[in-house]
Amino acid sequence: MQIDKLRGKELDQLFNSILSLKDLEECYRFFDDLCTINEIQSLAQRLEVARMLREGNTYHKIETETGASTATISRVKRCLNYGNDAYEMALDRVKETETESSSK
């Protein structure tokens, strides 16, 4: 994994801080303090690009709907094809949570 080069106390602290957040509102507050609006939007955009790629959408449609560049779309697609399956894991879990919430 590329991130292995960064492993250490500071990154562990960051990830453990994120894992400690209890709900969506705490996430909004934490990321508002931690990141710029553009950084948050970029992260959210990449996740949406991954979701759309998994659904089989074209680069053109993804670019039009998300504003992502073809370079970003290609980078996300490369991660989907050759990465650590983390996009799939996260998107599957979000989908499960949404399904559980809608069935209540």
Swiss-Prot record:
GO terms for molecular function: DNA-binding transcription factor activity; sequence-specific DNA binding. It comes from the Bacteria. SUPFAM superfamilies: TrpR-like. InterPro entries: Trp_repress (IPR000831), Trp_repressor/repl_initiator (IPR010921), TrpR-like_sf (IPR038116), YecD_YerC (IPR013368). NCBIfam families: yecD_yerC. This is Uncharacterized protein YerC. The gene is yerC.
